[in-house]
């Protein structure tokens, strides 16, 4: 009996997973598909992670976050001017535990920005439960 060893070339084509085309920044980041924590810590996030967070971020069917405009938006401007108003309109208020966890995981150089987001969310989102609003994971 003779054993045959199969050789594979270094340049052999390996098919990659296909994903839907998404509107992304030039660096491959899709802020509207990130969790709030990832957006705050951006650009220090892995550019490959955003595709895997789509399912975790969108655990409901309904209004999607506003699109990110890579020409006119910075991540901070996008969060404050577009994402937070969208969140307040469409999502339930995060719990105090979620907000505490969010702040505890923010990069040190972004902590003031993170604290202003938490303050904004705490004051803008009604304390009572609102029907027909989604529960969005923010961390």
From Swiss-Prot:
Region feature (Disordered): 1-26
Record field: compositional bias (Basic and acidic residues): 17-26
UniProt superkingdom: Viruses
This protein's name: Uncharacterized protein ORF26
Annotated organism of origin: Ictalurid herpesvirus 1 (strain Auburn) (IcHV-1)
């Amino acid at each position: 009996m003779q054993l045959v060893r199969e050789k594979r070339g270094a340049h052999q084509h390996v098919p990659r997973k296909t994903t839907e085309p998404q509107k992304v920044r030039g660096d491959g980041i899709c802020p509207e598909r990130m969790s709030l924590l990832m957006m705050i810590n951006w650009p220090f996030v892995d550019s490959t992670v955003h595709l895997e967070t789509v399912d975790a971020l969108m655990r409901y069917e309904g209004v999607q976050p506003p699109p990110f405009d890579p020409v006119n938006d910075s991540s901070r401007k996008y969060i404050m001017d577009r994402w937070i108003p969208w969140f307040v309109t469409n999502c339930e208020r995060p719990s105090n535990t979620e907000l505490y966890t969010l702040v505890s995981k923010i990069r040190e150089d972004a902590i003031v920005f993170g604290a202003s987001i938490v303050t904004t969310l705490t004051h803008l989102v009604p304390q009572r439960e609102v029907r027909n609003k989604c529960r969005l994971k923010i961390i």
